Amino acid sequence: MADRKIIAVVGATGAQGGGLVRAILADPAGGFAVRAITRDVSTEKAKALAKLGAELVAADIDDPASVERAFKGAYGAFCVTFFWDHFSPEKEKAQARIMAEAAKRAGVRHVIWSTLEDTRKWVPLSDGRMPTLMQKYKVPHFDAKGEADKVFAELGVPTTYLLTSFYWDNLIHFGMGPKKGADGRLAFTLPMGDRPLPGIAAEDIGRCAYGIFKRGPAMVGQTVGIAGEHLTGGQMAQSLTRVLGQEVRYNEVSPETYRGFGFPGADDLGNMFQFNRDFNEDFRRPRSLEGSRALNPRLQTFERWLEANRSRIPLG
């Protein structure tokens, strides 16, 4: 490890961080070693990464001292937050600052900050097209990350800003997969109209991040968007039909209807889909499929991801 550049990966047992850890470990000749950062190094997921060869370090992104210790001696750091743990944009911004300040103090030479757009640049709080949430946000889990971009910049942290896309894994873990209606037919529900939604396999986010680290200092200061495909709800339903072997229809609903579904975060996600729909070209433009594949030649299509994961998708 001494002659390899250490990449400290926050959220190493999570969707994005785990993909990066595995990408680094799968490339022993790549010149990098991985430091897997997680709150609890005793979990089965953490132990599995250690068996693959990762260095495990316990740190909590709410605890500045622990993050600085975890970043010390690292060449690079992958910084990510998980809004859905707490539903607090204020906490998310505080965590981003803790990581940025720790990277600065530790002398990290290349940070990747997993971010999203601040939608208020398109839809000001005064704009009534979508409701304002928590008094200060339109899409809280987007806006907090986008607002935090400036923290890395103001501190002079050498950062690449990674714009992610809709996780196809949400069909497994977030209850967004096809559901049976009263007629017994499966329906895939999105409030996207006929507009394409950039999506990606969560594992590929980490692989793309690894591609950024391999390119090195030339990527510092750049904003890089990634996606596996841009697909309409209808196209996704067609793929689900082919792979699952049973008909799945696209159930197009309005953002208003989606916001009213009542599950935790439904209002945030309803606004997110409305932003993606109403500003579709602006949202899709930075998420280049060609650029994503250049970073990650193993980039999966939606159907390829479905074929590998169909048994994991609950069909309610």
Regions found by a protein language model. Give the residues of each.
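Universal eukaryotic N-terminal targeting presequences
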Residues: 1-2, 315
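Short, functionally important structural connectors and interaction interfaces within domains
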Residues: 53, 189-192, 223, 287, ...
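Cofactor-binding loops of NAD(P)H-dependent oxidoreductases
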Residues: 59
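Short, conserved active-site loop motifs that form the nucleotide-linked donor/cofactor pocket
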Residues: 53-54, 159
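A hydrophobic C-terminal alpha-helical subdomain
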Residues: 219, 244, 255-316
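Oxidoreductase cofactor-interface core, primarily capturing Rossmann-like NAD(P)-dependent enzymes
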Residues: 2-48, 62-72, 76-94, 101-112, ...
